[in-house]
Amino acid sequence: MDMPVNEVRELRWDEYDSHQHLKNASKQAHDRKYNEFLIVDVDAHHYENEHYGEVFQYIESPVIRRNALEGIKRGGRSSMMNSEVGYQDTGGRMTRHWLRKHEKVPADKHRDVGITNKWMDAMGVDYSCLFPTPMLFLGTHPQVEVEVQLVNAYNRWLVERILAHEPRIISMLYLHFNDPEAAYKTVKEFAGKKGVKGFMITSPRYKPVHDNAYMKTYRLIEETGMPLSFHAAYSWNEQSLQLQNRFIGVHALGFMWFNMVHMTNWIVNGLPERFPKLKVMWIESGLTWAYSLMQRLDHSYLMRTSDCPALKRKPSEYMREMYYSSQPMEMPEDKSILEATFKMIKADTQLVWSSDYPHWDFDLPSVIYDLPFLKEEAKRNILGGTAAKLFNLDTTPVKKIPAVG
């Protein structure tokens, strides 16, 4: 295997240990006494493609199941999956992306449970909300029935093979939004299952969130008391983003753009008034987009209230009642800018920390804990207290931070 050049230290390609990889994170965890309070990661990932042999066994359609299983026999990615151009490992420099196959985990645990537990402890995380990685792009799959079959299989596999065996790992299950009836059935089937703490819509897709076909699903989720989240991603196939010639541009814009589109439709079509008790969360878009969109929508609304007859308040007031994951959190040199953003979104009660680990731009809990303008109570709310209320979690810390030599 060709190795990235490194003149500073020797790189090994035959071993990998999350505790060693994240030893500085563990040092932070000890120094900041994370063991004294709850930390919940509302957005982390695994690479479900490494277990397609298991996942695809859950596909209900015999034709699609056979095609999917035959596709992975020949190596490479599955022939059933759509994919996106991307450079997540930055030319191999993100070594955890390709060395994780050497991670040693306890034999009595599913591999993904073992790997997830190791990095959680290293960071000082008590609970982690786990999402897929390649399947985040299924919303633009050209075959709706394939998305439905693959997502149904993944959800059942996740619930039965992962969530049922590790109480520290939770998830908000993928809703196949391109088929409204299938999305509704997913909520009916999985609400109340062990580890299922809500439901998630992948944001890169071209279905309007205000379509009446989804209203019964929103109502059902509202009745469960669980949150509905929109998980951002990018798509280089989006026509406007095809003008970008570098991954950095597509990534920076795409992760904001799709959630901005869905948020705008959610607000101007009066869904907060229609479902006032539905807890809505926006994941992995950072924070600045929300601050900006609040101002833009308020400015237009005050001149065109007739366009939004269902609204009784300014758009920003509804947005302040929603929840936002922190990562990838912008870090301006002038911290007063970040402080203003926190104030605008009511971060003390509406912001929830997320790592996005193991992706290339992940954040540690210290991005929140070390902010000078936050009081201790606000830090603890953002790092775990608010998420514990959202997900109905025990607030007793259960992490086991490894010792650092």
Model-derived regions, located:
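Mid-to-C-terminal alpha-helical segments outside catalytic/metal-binding sites
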Residues: D2-L38, N49, G53-Y127, R156-A164, ...
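Catalytic pocket-lining loop regions of alpha/beta-barrel enzymes
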Residues: M3-V5, Q149, L163-I170, L175, ...
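Divalent metal-dependent hydrolysis catalytic cores, especially in the metallo-beta-lactamase
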Residues: I39, L99-P106, N117-H141, R168-L175, ...
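Active-site entrance/lid segments in N-terminal catalytic domains of soluble metabolic enzymes
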Residues: P142, N152-A164, L173
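Aromatic-lined carbohydrate-binding/catalytic grooves of carbohydrate-active enzymes
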Residues: G139-E145, A191-K194
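Active-site flanking residues adjacent to catalytic metal/cofactor-binding acidic residues
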Residues: V40-V42, F230, I283, S355
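Metal-dependent nucleic-acid phosphoesterase active-site entry motif
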Residues: D43-Y47
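Short glycine-enriched, charge-decorated loop/helix-capping segments at active-site entrances
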Residues: Q143-E147, I368-D370
